Amino acid sequence: LSRLNKKLLRDLATHWAQVGAIVAVVALGIIMFTGPLLATRDLKDSVNDIYKRTHYEDFSASMDQAPATAAGRLASLPNVTTAEGRIIREAQARVLGHRLTVRVITVPDKGRPAVNGLIIEKGSYLPPGAGGFTMVEHHLSSEFNLKPGLPLTVVGDSGEMTFSISGSVVSPEYLRLVRSRAEYVTDPAQFGVI
């Protein structure tokens, strides 16, 4: 060994604690960088998978009123593969003695949504042709431990209506429950989606 290498080995042996601390700090830095990076990549893959499975919207537009034929006319435009209309309203609800605001989102009378499809978590999809049933989004279901068959009462413009819960669903629009762009986090005990 050359004199310089011998001196290096002597210095490493003398300052072993400092060398160990430097190695530990570098290793922790690498772990702290790669851990979140890998978690973000996995989360992005999961979200993209759900978006693909549910045919998540590329674009949406809100309006107060539109003719029933509007979605069909939009679907006939070039480069538009699917367009679907639905009604979205907010109302007050009671579930297991708790009052909260719910966002009521309609689904097609026949079949399942072609855009923003739903993944059944518990229970089943709405029974065809049967009224009086609703599905609840999984944040609401988890918050109140809702199971199929339990009642949910909605108070709207036309009065009070009680529905039987048919199932709990995951919606691509509400992977993270947010009521509006002004809120960063929404309390599922105060707001839900049905």
Positions of predicted regions on the chain:
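Short, membrane-interfacial amphipathic segments enriched in basic
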Residues: 1-6
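Membrane-interface junctions
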Residues: 14-18, 53, 158, 171
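Hydrophobic, regular-secondary-structure patches
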Residues: 18-103, 124, 128, 139-150
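Residue-level signal for secondary-structure boundary sites
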Residues: 69, 112, 173-174
